[in-house]
Amino acid sequence: MSYNFLFINNHFSILGGNDCGASVRSTVLIEALAHIGQVDIINFCDKKISKDSENCNIIYENYISDENPATHQHNLSTRLQKYIKPFNPQSHFTINREKESIIDAVIHSRADKNPYDYVVCRYISEAVTCGLLKYADRLILDVDDNPFSETLRTLAHINPWQPWKYITGLYRAISVNAMTNKILGKNCISFHSNKIDSPHKSSIYLNNVPGVCHETTTFTCIENHKILIVGWIDYAPNKYGITHFVKRIFPEIRKVVPDTTLNIAGKTKDETFFGWLNSNEGVNALGFVEDLQNEYNAAQVVIIPLYHGSGTSVKFTEAMSMGKPIVSTKAGVRGFDDICKENVHYLCAKTDKDFAQKIIYLLTSPAKCEALSINANNVAKDNLSKDHFFDTVEKAICRRNI
């Protein structure tokens, strides 16, 4: 059976413009849908789609800018709405009503004109701001990260000496949880990316897929003392982790292995932060990298300094697929406990000192690097492939139509 899908993209580059883990997942989801039907795409992202894909048709592509930025009065009104109507999705996600009404009109005119079997988008926030909740009976929603868990982890990092901030954060977490359950209880299919953190009892686990992977089965440790971090720098948990690593951990590594260098591959709009990164000795902030495969190939060790956030790390799946030895925090390997073992597939750092010591150990232990590389790559091949992703999407949709 062939299906007709309408895919809405509002934020991330897709089909040829993959510049972060979210872009990769969006693109693979479109490809999975195109594998079982025809996909019409409405793209509101500021980056045009640059790659043709089989069974995909771009029916609308236009970036709608925030021509009227929010005023102080509007911001105050938005904040008040979160407390006056805590379980109303618009209270949490509406930013620019004028822009969102234009987006809603564009989608509505096309969704009603054509008999689409399903309307598809990623993230609850996009479903709300694009006015898609009205299509709940045919809405496929890739939630990806659990919104409730994300707010709880943000709550855990609030200073205990700021009780009002903590109380409002807790209030938001409770509101987001109720709102998430309400939305996912009505829409027809939802997916999430972390096996141990489902946002709703009906949500289906859908594995992340690496954007790049190793093309051979031979792994040789490169003893060049190059460390690599990959990730969208403007994503708050990434920015915090990178900052912490550069300030607290990297200098300790260079005391023992002085020629160690750190390459950071990831886009950012924060030129001041980008400049600060490059001002640190041994640190090379590269910005957006077109060919990530070369960066992975050139690195001796890949690290994931993630201390909070939700979902699962696409960069962890990429590093495993590329057969690279990995040192990560506990948060960086969330959701992989059933397929990965510490010290077998990766090394896990519990403290700053432990992080530095384990990186130094790998930089000076080629045999351990090779063992980790082989084991990690085998796990990625068996559990994190596109085939797994495609199969999960197809089964979920076919089950719905039985």
Protein language model features and the residues they cover:
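Short hydrophobic beta-strand element within catalytic cores of glycosyltransferases
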Residues: 315-318, 325-330
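A charged, aromatic-enriched C-terminal amphipathic alpha-helix characteristic of glycosyltransferases
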Residues: 367-398
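Acidic donor-binding loop of glycosyltransferase active sites
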Residues: 282, 297-311, 322-325
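Conserved catalytic-core segment of nucleotide-activated headgroup transferases in glycan assembly
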Residues: 25-28, 205-277, 285-293, 297
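Conserved acidic donor-binding segment of nucleotide-sugar-dependent glycosyltransferases
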Residues: 344-353, 361-367
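Acceptor-binding helix/loop patch of EC 2.4 sugar-transfer enzymes
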Residues: 10, 68-94, 141-179, 232
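N-terminal subdomain of nucleotide-sugar transferases
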Residues: 1-62
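Donor nucleotide-sugar binding/catalytic pocket of nucleotide-sugar-dependent glycosyltransferases
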Residues: 148, 168-217
